[in-house]
């Protein structure tokens, strides 16, 4: 897409000026200006419209119809260049260079020079002038022909007429909107006249129409007076308006044809001839009168009159009316009358039958002295010639013949090709402004072949004759195809033909063409006043001898001078009539309507008589002149007569020969007649073409010589200019290059300056930021140094711990050797079981007797199981209420019952277990003191001592552990009491349960909302409702263990017996002691909501201890890393946080009591229950067999202080679903890959024996079911939440875990040392005294939270303060610190 490119960029002054003009025109801020918007500005530049249109076409490259700022600037540059030098060619080079001065615009300046016409024509050109009567008459006639009798003209018809004006559609639309006052879509006569008048003003580039007004003024509408024109009453006059001839010829750059047309088209409806018009007509007459004879013959006048494009009949009528002297020559008077009548006819006014009296009385004609009264008519009457004297005419409206010998070249013309019919011809006939204007200079000089040249100056409207050198006339450009040889029938016509060779030179000098198209004029009747034609005077010339071919304008050869003179006359007339306004009014006092009606006939007769008198007076005055001319004419006529006589004789001689041929050719004459006429026309055309070509050849020869001379001069000038241009171009390029370089350097320097400024600002900002960061980093470095020291100290402590644990590993190796020795002893003790077979047989017999009672008890157990489920739900609700700090209503009763039951249980347990109490206590004390478990226990006791009552992280969390403990104790109590299980006391169970939910101060435990275990439980148990129970369970276990260590130790076996029986018991006691040492603090394994398996296991301690013949590596696995698998945490059905039960303790208690073979129904129930809970790695059938074998050696356990809790509720184990859940739990735990599982020891012979004797045992011989449970606990606590090391020690104490410390989030840099988990055996409080080991690392939830925040870059003080503000909520404290950072 092409674009505007300035070789010389716009200067700052130009940019400011052009931007100002552009924004004034772009009122809507669209970035473009339309042609309609810039038209007033361009018109005010004073340049011609054609130049402005070329400027627009040059800058509007894509023909968009609008200009952007760049194109608008280019247009104003071109206007400035053209204002400085108007003759420059229109091209893109005008806007590429800078003009010497900016374009000047004046809104009151006319785009073209206007002629003043007279001194009184000082009117404001920006106002729309009033309509002249001439314009009203022209446009009224056009309306009548278009409307055809209708009162309005339809929009489509008016559009067709308007479009022929070749104005922009937008301009025509605005004119229509102004004229269609009622928006009806049709125009009445006044609206049509106004529209045509505005179109005429636009075409003439009148300043008032540069910007059409929004509303036409009222006085402009009032200037339209639609009075009918009366043509048969010559005394009725219409006053001249201020603009009698319009403004069509005022502002146009007129050509010869337009000036000539204006001479025939500018006539007012009045019949008075002004002095100015008379002067114009006289000037035309003088230009035609080359010989200065004072008269013009028909040979000159006929071609001139034909150029008016009136038909021949109308011209004959005008000739008849104007020829007041009744001769073949016109004087200035007759010529003025004929021209006046032609103008009237072209204006659409019907010609009268006689010359109006007002025309004859015009002062300009000089026929009458000035007299205001029309009654005083003393001038002699002149006979008015009638139309009867005119010879017969052949009306050829489209063709006019010219003499065949006419070889005079004519002036070239630029005429629009229009047809002779339709509204376009009417429009063009009425107003020559509708033709496209051709650019000419302000002054048009028309030259002819004489020494006179006619010059018309558009500025002052005056026509002058200047003496110039003779020049070759311009060639003909019109077609002469319509010319033919004319043979007149009258003697006068033949004399004219004879004189043609003499008149040819005159005809060549007087021919001209005109462009006006005449409208059709109806024929007129003969004049009512007839006169006798003089036989001695020549008749009216025949206008049919000249033809005008369709589509081409032809005339005789004097058009240059005549056209200029006619145009000057028309322009002068219009200016004179506008300036004189009311100078000439009708002086007839009787011109009013009534008087005119009465005197019309008398006036007509008087006018005729006056014409006759004037004609006779004139004839008398010119008799002498005519006498001399008559003599010459007689001589010429005589010669012509002789010539004709000779021709006549020749014709007579050939007449006889042609008579015979005439009869034969008469039939062909009619057919060939048309062909002859066509051939004659073609001959005339050929002759005309020949003469035109000859004249054109002469002209071209002259032009060629002139062109060659001018070409040589131009070449020389071009050479000089090219050299100058080359030098200037080189200089310009150098300057442009320098300007570009300088601008580039300026741009680069400015960009570098901006960049440097930005860089300096950024560097300063970075320096400030780095200063702040340095201070922060120094603070952080100090904190990190402090933290590094702390980590180093902790690392040293961990190294010490690792060394200590290495020493303990050595001790464990020694312990393993001892255990191997003990295993050997246990194998020896297996022989003792054979001694008990007989005893077991007896027990089986007794069991058969109690079978009936078992069935009854079984039914009761099922019922109690339902009650137990309800109690469990009730207890859960109570526990939730307790966790929320709500005490039940019967809290006091429950506490009292719990205390009584505890005392009773303690007494019974003491009475049963006092046999071996002393020996067991000694063994346990010795063993515990010598083992490495004591150190861990001492540590736990020290940490518990250090804890405060307000520690929300580590204690006083309500748990459900008391429930399980109560169940275990109750189960043992039920086993000891035999038939007492049939009627358990639920009230005692609730009291024991409530007692477990109280702390050592008797206050209900409040659950810690910020505990790391509660808030960060594993994913597998986060949604489990049993989580609060497991949290409560842990603290309850710890508190109960601390309170009851002394009582429990009294039931633990500890040393070897001397007798075989006691040796067997001692072996079992030693084996059980190992279990105690590994898991003394894990009180229970809550595999299900009920305590079925645990109760069953506790009722058969002897059997559970029997298969414990394991190696040291199995019971105490070597130290290894703790691998936590999140996916395994949910492998079991109950992914709860559970503790183990103190089964080994109960087992040892029962081993200490003497063997009493007293089978009970409870033993049978728990035997079946154990079968439902297979140990890990064993099948149910294997467990069943082991249970049966173990039943032969079953003894009653010693009842401790918790034996009465939930007594008799073990019957719930009958439910198959619970057993299945427990079985699934043990299987899942076994499959979880626990590293703490004990190896299954098979004793096939013992199992078979127990099976055969139907021994009711409570524990399978394959493994201890309490061992796999810690693995579940270990997996469920693998959540990455920070849990206190103390909590883990308490939960997993005694399990032999090889990893003591959980991964610390806040201290990732501390190396993880393989430290075994601390074992927490149950020892007396007096044994827990020892040195406190400072771990040196964060182990509590608080310290872990502080350390985690410290690892995020905050100081310990900030972390501690934030945690205190947020109630030790790590997430809230983190957000608080980040927000306040």
Curated annotation (Swiss-Prot):
Chain ranges of the UBA domain: 1338-1380
Polar residues compositional bias, start-end: 404-424, 432-447, 477-494, 960-989, 1005-1019, 1037-1049, 1061-1073, 1093-1103, 1147-1164, 1178-1195, 1253-1285
- Enumerate composition-biased segments (Basic and acidic residues): 905-919, 937-957, 1021-1036
CDD domains xrefs: EH (cd00052), UBA_scEDE1_like (cd14285)
Which GO MF terms does the UniProt record name?
calcium ion binding; ubiquitin binding
UniProt cross-references to SUPFAM superfamilies, sorted A to Z = EF-hand, UBA-like
Q: EF-hand domain: which residues?
A: 47-82, 167-202, 276-311
> What does the entry list as the binding residues for Ca(2+)?
180, 182, 184, 191
* Gene Ontology process terms (BP): actin cortical patch organization; endocytosis; endoplasmic reticulum unfolded protein response; endosomal transport; positive regulation of cytokinesis; regulation of protein localization
Mutant phenotype after disruption: Random budding pattern and morphological defects. Defects in fluid-phase endocytosis and defective internalization of the pheromone alpha-factor and uracil permease. Deletion has only a small impact on actin cytoskeleton organization. Deletion shows synthetic growth defects with thermosensitive mutants of PAN1, END3 and RSP5.
**Which segments show compositional bias classed as Acidic residues?**
1127-1139, 1214-1226
**Which residues are recorded as modified (Phosphoserine)?**
241, 244, 248-249, 265, 419, 495, 848, 931, 950, 964, 1008, 1012, 1020, 1069, 1087, 1093, 1095-1096, 1100, 1181, 1187, 1343
Q: Keyword annotations for this protein?
A: Calcium, Coiled coil, Cytoplasm, Endocytosis, Isopeptide bond, Metal-binding, Phosphoprotein, Repeat, Ubl conjugation
Q: Mind telling me which residue stretches traverse the membrane in this protein? A: none
An example of a Gene Ontology cellular component annotation for this protein is:
cytoplasm
Q: Tell me the outcome of changing residue 1374 to A.
A: Enhanced ubiquitin-binding
Q: What does this protein do?
A: Functions at the internalization step of the clathrin-mediated endocytosis (CME) as an early-acting scaffold protein. Requires clathrin adapter proteins, ENT1/2 and YAP1801/2, for normal spatiotemporal dynamics and viability. Binds to biological membranes in a ubiquitin-dependent manner.
State any further remark: Present with 1380 molecules/cell in log phase SD medium.
Q: Which family does it belong to?
A: Belongs to the VDP/USO1/EDE1 family.
Cite the record's note on assembly.
Answer: Interacts (via UBA domain) with monoubiquitin and ENT1 (via asparagine-proline-phenylalanine tripeptide motif called NPF). Interacts with PAL1 and SYP1.
Q: Mind telling me what this protein is named?
A: EH domain-containing and endocytosis protein 1
Q: Which organism is it from?
A: Saccharomyces cerevisiae (strain ATCC 204508 / S288c) (Baker's yeast)
């Amino acid at each position: 897409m092409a674009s505007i490119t300035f070789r010389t960029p716009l200067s700052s002054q130009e940019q400011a000026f052009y931007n100002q003009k552009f924004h004034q025109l772009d009122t809507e801020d669209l970035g473009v200006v339309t042609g309609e918007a810039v038209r007033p500005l361009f018109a005010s530049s004073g340049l011609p419209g054609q130049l402005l249109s070329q400027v627009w076409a040059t800058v509007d490259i894509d023909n968009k119809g609008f200009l952007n700022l760049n194109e608008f600037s280019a247009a104003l540059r071109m206007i400035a260049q053209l204002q400085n030098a108007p003759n420059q060619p229109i091209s893109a080079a005008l806007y590429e260079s800078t003009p010497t001065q900016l374009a000047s615009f004046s809104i009151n300046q006319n785009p073209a020079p206007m002629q003043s016409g007279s001194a009184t024509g000082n009117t404001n050109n920006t106002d729309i002038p009033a309509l002249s009567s001439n314009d009203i008459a022209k446009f009224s006639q056009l309306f009548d022909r278009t409307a055809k009798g209708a009162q309005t003209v339809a929009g489509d018809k008016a559009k067709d007429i308007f479009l022929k004006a070749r104005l922009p559609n937008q301009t025509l639309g605005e004119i229509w909107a102004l004229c269609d006052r009622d928006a009806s879509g049709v125009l009445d006569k006044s609206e049509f006249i106004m529209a045509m008048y505005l179109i005429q003003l636009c075409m003439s580039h009148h300043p008032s129409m540069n910007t059409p007004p929004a509303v036409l003024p009222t006085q402009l509408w009032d200037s339209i007076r639609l009075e009918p024109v009366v043509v048969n009453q010559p005394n009725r006059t219409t006053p001249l308006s201020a603009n009698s001839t319009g403004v069509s010829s005022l502002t146009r750059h007129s050509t010869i044809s337009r000036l000539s047309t204006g001479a025939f088209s500018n006539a007012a409806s009045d019949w008075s001839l002004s002095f100015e018009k008379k002067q114009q007509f006289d000037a035309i007459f003088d230009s035609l009168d080359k010989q200065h004879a004072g008269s013009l013959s028909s040979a000159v006048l006929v071609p001139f009159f034909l150029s008016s494009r009136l038909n021949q009949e109308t011209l004959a009528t005008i000739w008849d009316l104007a020829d007041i002297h009744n001769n073949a020559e016109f004087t200035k008077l007759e010529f003025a009358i004929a021209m006046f009548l032609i103008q009237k006819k072209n204006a659409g006014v019907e010609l009268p039958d006689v010359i109006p009296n007002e025309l004859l009385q015009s002062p300009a004609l000089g026929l009458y002295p000035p007299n205001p009264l029309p009654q005083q008519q003393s001038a002699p009457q002149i006979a008015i010639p009638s139309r009867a004297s005119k010879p017969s005419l052949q009306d050829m409206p489209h063709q006019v013949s010219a003499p065949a010998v006419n070889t005079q070249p004519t002036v070239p013309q630029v005429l629009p090709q229009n047809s002779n019919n339709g509204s376009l011809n009417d429009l063009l006939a009425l107003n020559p402004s509708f033709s496209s204007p051709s650019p000419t200079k302000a002054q048009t000089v028309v030259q002819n072949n004489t020494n006179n040249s006619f010059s018309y100056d558009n500025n002052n409207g005056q026509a002058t004759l200047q003496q110039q050198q003779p020049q070759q006339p311009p060639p003909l450009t019109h077609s002469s195809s319509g010319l033919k040889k004319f043979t007149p029938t009258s003697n006068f016509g033949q004399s004219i033909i004879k004189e043609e060779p003499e008149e040819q030179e005159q005809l060549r000098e007087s021919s001209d063409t005109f462009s006006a198209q005449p409208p059709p004029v109806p024929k007129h009747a003969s004049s009512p006043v007839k006169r006798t034609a003089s036989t001695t005077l020549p008749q009216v010339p025949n206008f049919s001898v000249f033809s005008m071919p369709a589509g081409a304008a032809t005339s005789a050869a004097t058009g240059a001078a005549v056209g200029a003179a006619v145009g000057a006359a028309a322009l002068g007339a219009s200016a004179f009539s506008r300036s004189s306004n009311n100078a000439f009014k009708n002086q007839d006092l009787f011109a009013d309507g009534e008087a005119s009606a009465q005197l019309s006939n008398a006036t007509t007769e008087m006018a005729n008589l006056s014409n006759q008198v004037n004609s006779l007076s004139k004839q008398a005055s010119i008799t002498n002149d005519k006498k001399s001319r008559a003599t010459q004419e007689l001589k010429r006529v005589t010669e012509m007569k002789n010539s004709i006589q000779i021709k006549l004789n020749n014709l007579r001689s050939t007449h006889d020969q042609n008579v015979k041929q005439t009869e034969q050719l008469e039939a062909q004459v009619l057919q060939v007649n048309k062909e002859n006429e066509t051939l004659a026309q073609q001959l005339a055309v050929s002759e005309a073409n020949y003469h035109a070509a000859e004249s054109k050849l002469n002209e071209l020869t002259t032009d060629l010589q002139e062109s060659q001379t001018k070409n040589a001069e131009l070449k020389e000038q071009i050479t000089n200019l090219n050299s100058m241009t080359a030098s200037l171009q080189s200089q310009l390029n150098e300057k442009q290059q320098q300007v570009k370089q300088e601008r580039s350097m300026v741009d680069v320097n400015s960009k570098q300056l901006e960049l440097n400024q930005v860089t300096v600002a950024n560097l300063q900002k970075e320096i400030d930021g780095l200063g702040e960061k340095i201070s922060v980093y120094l603070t952080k470095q100090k904190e990190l140094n402090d933290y590094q020291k702390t980590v180093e100290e902790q690392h040293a402590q961990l190294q010490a711990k690792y060394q200590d644990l290495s020493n303990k590993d050595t001790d464990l190796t020694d312990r393993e050797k001892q255990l191997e020795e003990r295993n050997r002893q246990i194998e020896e003790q297996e022989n003792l079981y054979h001694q008990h077979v007989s005893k077991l047989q007896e027990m089986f017999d007794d069991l058969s007797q109690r079978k009936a009672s078992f069935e009854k008890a079984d039914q009761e157990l099922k019922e109690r199981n339902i009650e137990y489920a309800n109690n469990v739900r009730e207890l859960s609700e109570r526990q939730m209420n307790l966790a929320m700090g709500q005490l039940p209503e019967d809290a006091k009763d429950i506490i009292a019952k719990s205390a009584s039951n505890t005392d009773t249980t303690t007494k019974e347990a003491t009475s049963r277990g006092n046999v071996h109490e002393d020996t067991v206590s000694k063994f346990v004390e010795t063993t515990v003191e010598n083992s490495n478990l004591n150190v861990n226990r001492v540590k736990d006791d020290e940490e518990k001592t250090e804890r405060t009552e307000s520690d929300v992280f580590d204690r006083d969390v309500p748990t459900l552990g008391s429930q399980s403990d109560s169940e275990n104790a109750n189960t043992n109590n039920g086993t000891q009491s035999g038939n007492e299980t049939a009627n358990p006391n639920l009230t005692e169970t609730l009291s024991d349960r409530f007692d477990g939910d109280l702390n050592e101060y008797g206050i209900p435990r409040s659950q810690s909302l910020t505990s790391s275990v509660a808030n960060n439980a594993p994913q597998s148990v986060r949604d489990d409702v049993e989580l609060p129970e497991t949290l409560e369970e842990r603290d309850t276990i710890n508190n109960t263990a601390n309170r009851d260590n002394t009582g429990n130790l009294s039931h633990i076996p500890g040393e070897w017996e001397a007798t075989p029986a006691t040796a067997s018991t001692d072996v079992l006691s030693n084996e059980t002691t190992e279990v105690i040492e590994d898991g003394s603090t894990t009180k229970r394994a809550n595999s299900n909501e009920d305590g079925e398996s645990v109760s069953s296991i506790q009722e058969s301690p002897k059997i559970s201890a029997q298969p414990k013949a394991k190696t040291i590596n199995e019971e105490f696995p070597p130290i290894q890393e703790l691998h936590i698998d999140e996916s395994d945490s949910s492998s079991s059905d109950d992914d709860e946080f559970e503790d183990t039960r103190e089964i080994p303790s109960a087992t040892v208690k029962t081993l200490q009591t003497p063997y009493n073979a007293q089978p009970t129904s409870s033993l049978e129930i728990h035997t079946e229950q154990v079968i439902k809970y297979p140990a890990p790695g064993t099948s149910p059938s294997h467990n069943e067999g082991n249970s049966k074998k173990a039943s032969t050696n079953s003894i009653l356990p010693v009842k401790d202080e918790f034996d009465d809790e939930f007594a008799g509720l073990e019957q719930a184990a009958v439910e198959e679903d619970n057993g299945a859940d427990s079985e699934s739990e043990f299987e899942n735990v076994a499959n979880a890959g626990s590293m703490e599982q004990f190896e299954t020891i098979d004793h096939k012979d013992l199992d078979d024996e127990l099976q055969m004797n139907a021994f009711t045992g409570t524990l399978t011989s394959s493994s201890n079911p309490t061992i796999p449970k810690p693995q579940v606990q270990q997996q469920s606590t693998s959540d990455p939440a920070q849990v206190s090391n103390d909590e883990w020690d308490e939960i997993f104490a005694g399990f032999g875990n090889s990893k003591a410390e959980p991964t610390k989030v806040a201290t990732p840099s501390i190396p993880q040392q393989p430290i075994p988990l601390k074992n927490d055996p149950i020892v007396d409080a007096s044994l827990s005294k020892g040195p406190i080991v400072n771990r040196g690392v964060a182990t509590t939830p608080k310290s872990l939270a502080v350390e985690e925040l410290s690892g995020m870059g905050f100081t310990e003080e900030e972390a501690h303060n934030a945690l205190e503000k947020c109630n030790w909520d790590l997430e809230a404290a983190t957000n608080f610190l980040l927000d306040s950072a």
